[in-house]
């Protein structure tokens, strides 16, 4: 639990430190980044990035889920899997305007999954590709 709180604090500090001045409310950009067993990023920012590398997302089946990230700067990749019902519910709540933070255990199972949906995140493009 303490580690989950630490990851949430790191994510919140990232949001605060990357905040840009905006005319109509606070806005932040959260590019995909990966560190030791921890990944984060906003779906809309990854999709709108100038590079063709960064990616973050999660998917589920009836009984399991997987989160995957590719860091634009280093092209490192990360993934974790889960069968935890609470984590699956969080993964299923992801929208195109969400930010995802996940961490994993040494065996590749998801330790934590956090989903943020907020007005300060970039809205998803409405025009598609």
Task: Give residue ranges: language-model regions.
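Bacterial N-terminal signal peptides
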Residues: 8-17
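N-terminal secretory signal peptides
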Residues: 22-66, 70
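Short, charged beta-turn/beta-strand-edge "cap" motif at the junction between a beta-strand
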Residues: 103-112
